[in-house]
């Protein structure tokens, strides 16, 4: 299995100091992976994390700010999720391509995926579950096609 850092098949820190450390923001470079940064970000939602900032300041990267307000236990949970996602990338990337998996999708009578509902919704044991509100949407379309809804009541 590829390591999380130091390999062409990993998610690398894009910027780091000469001593190898990063600041409170880490920019993970996903450009060498067989999936996109968006795929990884959406899968993080299945693990109960808020999707990180995407493609800023570099295309196909994720900016994560883990140390601002998170406990050590939460940081360990994030690292575990990233390690699991790394495995999924090379074992069954469809699970990333279809993420996030909502409660509605997982509980539907129709299941068309080549992985289990449990793998989709509960990739790790958790005492509670954060369910994403919506499944995969086309973020780029939304960014490029601004729709302004202004309701004026007189």
Regions found by a protein language model. Name each.
Residues 1-6, 10-11, 153:
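Single conserved hydrophobic/aromatic residue that forms the stacking wall/gate
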Residues 7-8, 12-37, 47-62, 90-99:
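Conserved small-domain helix->loop->beta segment predominantly found in fold-type I
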Residues 35-39, 73-76:
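Generic alpha-helical secondary structure signal
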Residues 39-49, 81-88:
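Generic non-transmembrane alpha-helical segments
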């Amino acid at each position: 299995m590829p390591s999380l850092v130091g390999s062409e098949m990993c998610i690398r820190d894009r910027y780091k100091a000469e001593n190898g450390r990063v600041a409170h923001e880490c920019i993970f470079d996903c450009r060498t992976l067989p999936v996109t940064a968006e795929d990884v970000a959406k899968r993080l939602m299945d693990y109960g994390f808020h999707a990180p900032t995407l493609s800023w300041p570099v295309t196909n990267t994720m900016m994560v700010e883990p140390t601002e307000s998170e406990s050590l236990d939460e940081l360990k949970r994030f690292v575990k999720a990233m390690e699991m996602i790394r495995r999924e990338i090379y074992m069954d990337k469809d699970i990333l391509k279809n993420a996030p998996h909502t409660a509605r999708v997982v509980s539907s009578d129709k299941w068309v995926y080549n992985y289990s509902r449990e793998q989709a919704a509960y990739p790790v044991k958790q005492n509670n579950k954060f369910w994403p509100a919506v499944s995969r949407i086309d973020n780029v379309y939304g960014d490029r096609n601004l729709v302004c809804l202004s309701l004026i009541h007189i």
